[in-house]
Amino acid sequence: ADPDQLATDIPDLDMVDPDEPASAELIEMARACEDAARSIEGITNSDGAEASWGHSSVTLAATNGFAGHYARTDCGVGVSVIAGEGTDMEGEYDFAHAVYRADLEDAGAVGIRAGERAVARLGARRMSTSQIPVVFDPRVAGGLLGHLSGAIAGPSITRGTSFLKDSMGKQIFAPGIRIIDDPHRPRGQRSKPFDAEGVANKKRALIEDGHLTTWLLDLSSARQLDLETTGHA
């Protein structure tokens, strides 16, 4: 990377929670999550619940003179349960994660949602083929954004394997849709102050009014495309 591409003003993204929970607290969170899920009528068994807390750190030093460090914590809770009996049984799960434990969704609410999801799957029937409006569950919507980021990643574009390789500037979402990538969001679960090559990253629009506006480039893919890296190594 050129010196002017490197991150020099590394922001504090408030990603370390000093309040580390004791093991007994995590056990109680998992128990509360499972109890809430099993309280839903129709739930017949549990595949288990879990609660976790972790601390990780990243230090990057490169021959180009870059040196940077950041750390993060993560607290999570989740449960998997089974609804129904005999040949009519369905399983579902739910979970929540946050950088700060204080921001984590209530364990009981996570459990209730998992139980309700499992019960809602009972008696499902196949639909006939048709064209109808679709409302995506938030969990599915997140997956769609994952497919988008993979399709506009530099390596996929340079190899020509992306279904969006010829879509720069074209409308690929409905008008009015704007999708933002913000690596500097305080307490963001995927926030980071620089990328894996020490390049400065920043908030940018991926989709504006339904139109694709950028690729997600590291140094190698940027060179191959004769473009500037976007700090997505």
Regions found by a protein language model. Give the residues of each.
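C-terminal, non-catalytic macromolecule-binding modules
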Residues: 211-233
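Active-site bordering "gate/hinge" segments
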Residues: 1-202, 208-211
